[in-house]
């Protein structure tokens, strides 16, 4: 079976069709890093440089030295995640989605909990309305989202630390 993904005009809004990014669902092939980056660029180009994330419902959670980020991915939406600097927990709170990374591809569903390694970047297709939560260290114990994102998110693979780049095969 072929899974055809769509590229949204806004990350969680209307979309147009693009030929397969992933094949043979539910155990489709891993995506190449370059394919995921191209998909992300296409989304940005369609949205005038804007990723459309503000159209997805995003909730922030804070506990001492812990930051949780929860996003609602509407059924049928396709999104590309950020590159994270550190290992962190992922919790699929609700729904089902197909996920492709350079390390493998699989389906995630409500109740799944897993660790993302530093440098992981995902292309995600929400099969159902999906609530996805990531849990990150917040060593500064701040609620300043700009400061948290600077610590948590790498703007590019080149921005990862040397140790992290060895883990993802960049160094």
Stretches found by the model and what they are:
Residues 127-171:
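Double-stranded beta-helix
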Residues 77, 85-86, 104, 120, ...:
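A generic "binding-loop/recognition-motif" signal
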Residues 64-84:
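Conserved short histidine dyad/triad with adjacent acidic residue
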Residues 1-70, 150, 159-171:
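A short, N-terminal "cap"/entry segment at the start of jelly-roll beta-barrel domains
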Residues 85-103:
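Glycine- and acidic-residue-biased ligand/ion/polar-headgroup-sensing regions
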Residues 101-121:
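Short acidic-glycine-tyrosine-enriched beta hairpin
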């Amino acid at each position: 079976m072929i899974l055809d993904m769509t590229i949204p005009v806004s990350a969680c809004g209307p979309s147009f069709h693009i030929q397969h990014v992933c094949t043979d669902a539910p155990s489709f092939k891993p995506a190449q890093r370059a394919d995921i980056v191209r998909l992300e660029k296409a989304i940005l180009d369609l949205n005038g440089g804007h990723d459309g994330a503000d159209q997805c419902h995003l909730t922030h959670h804070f506990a001492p030295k812990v930051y949780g980020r929860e996003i609602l991915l509407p059924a049928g939406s396709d999104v590309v995640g950020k590159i994270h600097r550190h290992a962190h927990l992922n919790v699929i709170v609700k729904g089902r989605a197909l996920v492709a990374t350079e390390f493998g591809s699989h389906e995630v569903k409500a109740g799944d909990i897993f660790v993302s390694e530093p440098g992981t970047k995902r292309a995600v297709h929400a099969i159902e309305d999906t609530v996805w939560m990531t849990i990150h260290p917040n060593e500064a114990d701040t609620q300043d989202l700009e400061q948290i994102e600077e610590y948590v998110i790498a703007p590019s693979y080149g921005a990862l630390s040397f140790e992290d780049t060895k883990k993802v095969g960049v160094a």
